[in-house]
Amino acid sequence: MRAIAVLCMVEVHTAAIIPPEGVTVGDPMAFVAAAFGGMAAPMFVTISGWGMYMSAQRRRAQGFSGSDWVRWIVPRVLLLTACQVIVNLFLNVERGGRFEWQTPGVLTLLAVAAILSPILSRIPFSFRSAILLLACASPVVLGDTSGPELGWFERVGSEGIFEWLERLFVNGTYPIAPWIFYVILGTLVYDLRESPDVREKGIIMGLIATALTILISAIEEVDWALTEGDAVLTFFPASTPFLIVSGTMAVLAMRILEGSEARGGEPAFGDKLTFLEPSGRLSLTIYVSHFAVLGIAAMVLEGEPRLALVPAFLATSIHTIVWIPLAIAHEKYIPGISIEGLLRTIQSGR
């Protein structure tokens, strides 16, 4: 699941840097790319929340003291924050990219999740469910504070610490409100790992809600989904319907891939997807590294006309798929050289 999520992130970021000529918002290919994009980050954050919560639960069971928690959390937070800055520098606006060096992003969101993970591991399921509902409703509560009128470069820019904190908490690319929704969702899915029937009921409710959003779109005669603008589902800023639909799809994808494991059986595809496992174990390294490639592409393509459909499609596909064999080769020849390996080294013995 983690591998699929990070590869979807690679695909949507590549498509944004190398958009094909002549493809409009209503084009079927644009819809497919947008679907991957809309699902990539929610899946990535949900599975990351799942993993952090699992790690926190395990360490809580080991009787971690306050100092143990600090030694576990601080390196993780510092590394994720440093990686976010590196990503921002790789794809900086000064070189045809998309980010300011200080832009908060998905990795700073995960850094906050790491800080919260010991607390979340102690909060009862019912209370976390209530927090999930509050996070889901937060776009409605925030209203214009979430910055629906902000353009991209306003959303990634900030003047001073106060505006930076605004971007981190409420109106950046992946602000804590409402994106903490997916972290909490990951913790709930983990707690329900042995209760597939309960998860399936939740998925059915989510699919019904998804159908209702499509119906509302048809009745109101507005777009169903757009990256930003006037639509039922919007990514920037994330709307409540977007949270519900993408959260449902993330949990559905996890349930499909799980197969009958929770009931003592096999995963849905058996061993057919094991070739993706190295990519999942290197998800952070792949996430950071692919921005280095995109940064070069952004510099080369700056000021140039867009590529034709076929070359753009091939470039996006190749750049997405190539990380699979690279991850396999990495595990075979240099398994210790990675961001994940660096974190393990820093935290060794803890």
Predicted stretch roles:
Residues 1-350:
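Alpha-helical transmembrane segments and their immediate juxtamembrane cytosolic regions
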